[in-house]
Amino acid sequence: MIRDPRPSAPYGHSGAVTAAFAENIDIYRTLADLAGLNTEVESSVDGVSLAPLLVNPDHTQNPKAKHAAFSQQAHCLMDPHTNLPIDVWTVADSCTMTPRNSLGFMGYSIRTDDWRFTAWLQWDAIALRANWSAINATELYNHTGDDGLTISALDDYENDNVAQLNPDIVRSLMAQLRGHFAPAEPRE
């Protein structure tokens, strides 16, 4: 993700590769850190600096390294039927011109070393909130052995949804998703 074009990298690891998780949200903090501006970045800015990985690409030695990557994606579903597998939903090509109040489902995903899990939840597009008790579908893909570097078919590891075969893993990853994305319950 980050390449220093100078012939000898000041960080000591020219061309090094890391297995650390990185998200787009980390880019701003990383660039600010590399520019020496990290102390100027407000605490309200999300993300973590990936600059320490340039010094030591071994993410297991970095206490701030992420254990997972998270994402969310709205889908514009036409005539979705509850309890059908995700692959038989009729999905529109693009949400670009879809009115906000027509977005009925939000997919929340977590990617760990061994798994990618997505939960498709009913979405209240007016309140901008997912209904965490209304799970429409789940997807779980085993990425054991996927180092992210081996050239393979685009979706070699995402051909078989194994969610029904791994209920304990689904519960664990769902709890992590909810902890990351779900808002705290309102206090009275």
Residue ranges and their predicted role:
Residues 1-44, 48-63, 80, 147-150, ...:
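Substrate-binding rim/cap in mid-to-C-terminal beta-strand-loop elements of soluble/periplasmic
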Residues 22-29, 33, 44-52, 104, ...:
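A structural signal for well-ordered alpha-helical segments within the folded catalytic domains
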Residues 23, 71-163:
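C-terminal, low-complexity/hydrophilic appendages and adjacent surface loops
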Residues 63-66, 177-188:
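Bilobed periplasmic-binding protein-like "clamshell/Venus-flytrap" ligand-binding domains
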Residues 69-70, 169, 184:
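Intrinsic low-complexity/disordered segments
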Residues 46-47, 73-75, 121, 184-188:
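Short, solvent-exposed turn/loop segments enriched in Gly/Ser/Thr/Pro and often Arg
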